[in-house]
């Protein structure tokens, strides 16, 4: 069985935490912890060839920066091209195995919408059947790509937009979208991610490091209890300087 099949299988009764006959999705004001659900959706299509080390290095640097701090961080890493492949499935960030070049092999097309849609469904189901005290306070989707959607077969842009709107408006989930070679703000807007959560990056060594450093800054601000703004553009300032 491929990892992607295991990752997206229906929840079994043993996974229901004592709730086999129903479940509740808790709203953002009802959190009982300071934990974070951190979901990476990373482009592994053929156009990313030549940037393997930059992608892996940027990802690993972000993981290292997010270690420590208050609350647990559960990391899921979904790589996508024509299909989806899972490197991490809700692994505690303190225990996570960093990626290597062997984990990242670009090929194929860009099924971005399917990667987002299936990941939202998976995390939503986890939260739905979890005990209230186990649902993380923060849920953050970090999405990176270097090209336009061209291969999804399950989800449309309008369906993803509806899903993201529900999760952001009702449950306080955050989605950030950082892209190269396309208009990130326009593309993000088509799927319901507002412009304050979107940015472009350059495909260079410095550009990749700025990309992951900026995304890490967004996550740091969200995890912080200092009420730091996420709408002032400061989290992506480093990208503007590249």
Where in the sequence are the language-model features?
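Acidic, low-complexity intrinsically disordered regions
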Residues: 1-242
């Amino acid at each position: 069985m491929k990892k992607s099949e295991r990752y997206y299988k229906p929840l079994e009764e043993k996974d229901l935490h004592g709730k086999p006959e129903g479940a509740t999705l808790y709203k953002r004001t009802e959190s009982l912890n300071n934990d974070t659900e951190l979901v990476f959706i990373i482009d592994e299509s053929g156009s990313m060839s030549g940037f393997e080390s930059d992608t892996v290095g940027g990802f690993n640097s972000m993981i290292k920066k997010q270690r420590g701090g208050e609350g647990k961080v559960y990391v899921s890493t979904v790589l996508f091209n024509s299909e989806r492949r899972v490197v991490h499935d809700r692994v505690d960030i303190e225990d996570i195995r960093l990626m290597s070049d062997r984990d990242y092999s670009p090929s194929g097309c860009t099924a971005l919408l399917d990667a987002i849609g299936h990941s939202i469904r998976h995390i939503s189901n986890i939260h739905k059947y979890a005990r209230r005290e186990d649902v993380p306070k923060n849920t953050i989707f970090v999405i990176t790509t270097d090209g336009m959607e061209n291969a999804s077969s399950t989800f449309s842009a309008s369906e993803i937009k509806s899903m993201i709107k529900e999760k952001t408006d009702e449950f306080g989930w955050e989605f950030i979208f950082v892209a190269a070679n396309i208009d990130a703000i326009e593309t993000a807007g088509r799927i319901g991610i507002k412009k304050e959560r979107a940015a472009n990056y350059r495909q260079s060594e410095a550009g990749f490091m700025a990309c992951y450093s900026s995304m890490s800054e967004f996550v740091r601000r969200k995890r912080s209890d200092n009420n730091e703004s996420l709408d002032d553009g400061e989290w992506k300032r480093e990208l503007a300087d590249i």
